[in-house]
């Protein structure tokens, strides 16, 4: 009986004030839910973008597929280098205009920047023929020239290398090192793009120069 009397004395909260409080609680909950949904969506997009960037960083890059040198009998060594590069499998397009060529020889490190691109190398009988490939003159002590070897979509004309492309870096070794490279000399370095793995360059010149064009790597 006492229980019933106690409950009988209690009245439920009623009125417009209670309704306002209830609506306010619902609105607060709705706003909180919207904030959580927006935050989770933003974080998901951020994670996807970061994952894509990480994948590009890992997969993208360049590889060196060969290095040849030109022997100048008058200078007594290799005066020009042709460094052949191509993108790694799955690589994103790479802008060669922002790439740096690092070369180490005779205890000195040299950094070369992009100069220009030439299509005169397409189908050239001699990549070292400076008469046919006049842009060799733009390869100096601080710059390299990009030559087009294979470029189906014409992207290399703008300095961009992508899937299936092959380019050659024309380097005036005599100007860079202030002398031609003699026999039994070690040269190393890398061609570093703006992002991704670099193309590694490593070779030692032969004990004797018997030909004008020599395969080095």
From Swiss-Prot:
One of its GO terms (biological process) is archaeal or bacterial-type flagellum-dependent cell motility. Residues 1-12 form a propeptide. It is found in: Archaeal flagellum. One of its GO terms (cellular component) is archaeal-type flagellum. The keyword rRNA-binding does not apply. One of its GO terms (molecular function) is structural molecule activity. Pfam families: Arch_flagellin. InterPro entries: Flagellin/pilin_N_arc, Flagellin_arc. Keywords: Archaeal flagellum. The keyword Cell division does not apply. Belongs to the archaeal flagellin family. NCBIfam families: arch_flag_Nterm, PRK08541.1. Flagellin is the subunit protein which polymerizes to form the filaments of archaeal flagella. This is Flagellin B1.
